[in-house]
């Protein structure tokens, strides 16, 4: 029996919820399905507050951003719980929350290595797509040999 290694990139959008729902509907309960829930976050800059008195003012902003990052990590755990409640076995779900080094699209392409299925959601907004090529488009054009499911 072939194993379905599924990558679920997650970026906290309503469309990403559709991708989660699709993965549950399509693959939950299948013993051969393994899911990696993945989010790569933009790292916070390191600020030396002793270098300048102006840098001290940034401390509260950085504290806020660090707290927001922690909330996002906890929110990803909630999504992991949704997958478990949806029918995936605990040992079949891996949650990855890591610092982004490359572009979001490149991180997804790197992470999908070894996976047989990628579940994406389409980004919303024609205006946004006009100004920046969507992550969805960059990932889809870069991949070969992976089944791509698009929840929209």
Locate each region found by the language model.
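A short acidic, amphipathic alpha-helical/loop segment
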Residues: 21-22, 107-108, 135
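Short, hinge-like loop/turn segments at secondary-structure boundaries
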Residues: 53-56, 113, 138
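Structural beta-alpha unit
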Residues: 81-118, 145
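A structural signal for isolated positions on well-ordered beta-strands in alpha/beta enzyme cores
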Residues: 5-7, 34-36, 94, 118, ...
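A short acidic, glycine-rich active-site loop
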Residues: 57-74
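Glycine-rich, Arg-bearing micro-motifs that act as flexible, cationic patches
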Residues: 117-143
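Small/aliphatic-rich secondary-structure junction motif
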Residues: 2-61
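Short, flexible loop segments at boundaries between secondary-structure elements
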Residues: 142-152
């Amino acid at each position: 029996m072939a194993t379905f290694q599924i990558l679920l990139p997650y970026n906290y959008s309503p469309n990403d919820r559709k991708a989660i729902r699709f993965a549950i509907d399509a693959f939950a309960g299948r013993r051969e399905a393994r899911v990696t829930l993945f989010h790569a976050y933009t790292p916070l800059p390191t600020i030396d507050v002793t270098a300048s008195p102006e840098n001290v003012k940034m401390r509260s902003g950085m504290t806020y951003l660090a707290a927001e990052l922690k909330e996002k990590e906890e929110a990803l755990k909630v999504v992991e719980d949704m997958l478990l409640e949806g029918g995936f076995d605990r040992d079949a779900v891996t949650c990855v929350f890591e610092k982004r080094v490359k572009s979001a699209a490149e991180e997804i392409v790197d992470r999908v290595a070894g996976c047989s299925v990628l579940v994406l959601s389409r980004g919303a907004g024609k205006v946004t797509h006009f100004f920046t090529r969507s992550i969805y488009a960059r990932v889809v054009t870069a991949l070969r040999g992976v089944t791509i499911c698009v929840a929209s």
